[in-house]
């Protein structure tokens, strides 16, 4: 990863943590109907994984009936991704970064307060209509997209997948994938390039807050 790549990723993390316009204009799993139809079409020709996808579809349906489609579950999933990211950051760096972000927030729970505030921004996005997601997941295109993006997450970012998979939250990942991309990219970078490169990224984030 080049210095320019680190700078660009640090900028996106800072913007995600500090500004509301980071999320504005972003696509999401509900509105991108073209992508849903694309995954539906791909599912028809992807005969090699038909058996495994059939099992995954059963998991989707069971998860829906257990109430997975809700804003609270989306917020929980995003919060877990923040937690993975924060586990790799030293206590001193977390204290410095989150105290700068917190503004009027005070007390010993500053980090959790900032994380929850950012998670709610994503979970409460106007276009994240859980009713539409519920019926969409029962249909073909959105269900296929959910399964394929979960599979991609498992391959590209197994640490995040493992954490979300515990409660089937990986099936919701496609809804907010773009919004949390700076965090998942940083987590993946740490796994690929090591803690030294990750710490260098965090130094850049700290200097930009």
Task: Indicate where each model-derived feature is located.
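Charge-rich, solvent-exposed alpha-helical interaction surfaces
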Residues: 9-12, 29, 36, 63, ...
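Mature extracellular/secreted ectodomains of secretory-pathway proteins
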Residues: 38, 42-107
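Membrane-engaging insertion elements
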Residues: 5-51, 75, 128-187
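Organelle targeting or membrane-anchoring low-complexity regions in eukaryotic organelle proteins
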Residues: 10-15, 104-112, 205-209
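Low-complexity, intrinsically disordered, cysteine-poor segments enriched in small/polar
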Residues: 25, 29-36, 40, 77, ...
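C-terminal assembly and membrane-engagement modules of membrane-active proteins
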Residues: 173-209
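Membrane-inserting effector segments that mediate pore formation, membrane fusion
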Residues: 92-149
